[in-house]
Design a protein with these regions (language model features):
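Phosphate-coordination loops involved in phosphoryl transfer and adenosine-cofactor binding
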Residues: 63, 131-134, 190, 270
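Glycine/serine-rich phosphate-binding loop and adjoining beta1-alpha1 elements at the start
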Residues: 1, 54, 62, 74-120, ...
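FAD-site-proximal beta/loop scaffold in flavoenzymes
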Residues: 101-132, 217-274
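A conserved short coil-to-beta-strand element within the FAD-binding core of flavoproteins
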Residues: 62-78, 190-202, 213-215
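Short hydrophobic core segments
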Residues: 80-88, 136-138, 238-245
Length: 274
């Protein structure tokens, strides 16, 4: 998505349009900067793309949240003729299970942003990030693989992917799974968290897993995970990273009166994307 945004900005500038990009964070690049680890996509590669856009005349305004810092109405008053919303799917989903509010349970978005964009792993950084020794990452997508591989690089002695389906149903790319295994990541497939247990300080210390089996295919075409009655397992952890999907960022849509949204919170558009 962010790559497509760079291409669109470049093409608009090539056709002579004045393009201004409003970025909520303190660095340009979106998920390419905060979501993808340096070991998979070096920042210098992204910086080259951004510099190319700047050389073509694209303006970048950082630390500006449309819908909060500025409204869409204000942009229209400043004579912007077209507004393209590319705020992404930055709202992390959680499982809403008991104990999920315990300390040291983070979304993959927050964890990767702290490490990638805010340099939380550096001793000189003021941004806190938990350095777990026994880390559970919940989910089976590419972001889950990025999170668990990052945890290994930050010193996790045991790093696990916990996924409710089998490995064959994992949405992560085959090469990402391969790299994770090569780096010592464990895969607990057909397991699903049902509860977190915290210690006296409120920090997560265990996760209770429901063992699953595969049933009939669901709407996605993958076989549905079905709980095995009475089959649970409790494992010790000191950090959980939840990577079970994201939803569209609601800030921009909620700030525009009369905007129609789809079932999943996406902006409804016509054939010309308006």
């Amino acid at each position: 998505r962010q790559r497509q945004m760079c291409i669109r900005d470049r093409d608009m500038a090539k056709y002579g349009y004045d393009v201004t990009v409003f970025e909520a964070l303190h660095e340009i690049g979106g998920v390419l900067k905060y979501g993808i680890p340096e070991f998979r996509l070096p920042n210098k590669v992204v910086d080259v793309e951004i510099e190319n856009l700047a050389q073509m005349g694209v303006k970048f305004i950082k630390d500006c949240i449309i819908g909060k810092t500025l409204s869409v109405e204000q942009l229209e008053e400043e004579d912007f003729k077209g507004i393209f919303v590319a705020s992404g799917a930055g709202l992390p989903n959680f499982m809403n299970i008991p104990g999920e509010n315990s300390i040291n349970i983070l979304s993959s978005n927050e964890y990767l942003t702290r490490v990638n964009l805010m340099d939380a792993a550096s001793e000189d950084s003021d941004t806190p990030v938990p350095f777990g020794k026994c880390v559970a990452v919940i989910g089976g997508g590419n972001t889950a693989m990025d999170s668990v591989r990052t945890a290994r690089r930050l010193g996790a002695e045991r790093a696990m992917i916990i996924y409710r389906r089998s490995e064959e149903e994992m949405p992560a790319r085959i090469e990402e799974v391969k790299h994770a295994k090569e780096e010592g990541v464990e895969f607990l497939t057909l397991h699903n968290p049902i509860e977190y247990i915290a210690d006296e300080q409120g920090k997560v210390k265990q996760v209770v897993l429901q063992k699953m089996e595969l049933g009939e295919p669901d709407a996605s075409g993958r076989r549905s995970p079905v709980p095995i009655p009475g089959a649970t397992e409790t494992i010790d952890i000191d950090l959980a990273i939840v990577s079970v999907g994201v939803s569209p960022n609601p800030i921009v849509p909620s700030s525009i009166k009369g905007l129609e949204l789809g079932r999943k919170g996406t902006i409804a558009v016509n054939d010309s994307m308006q």
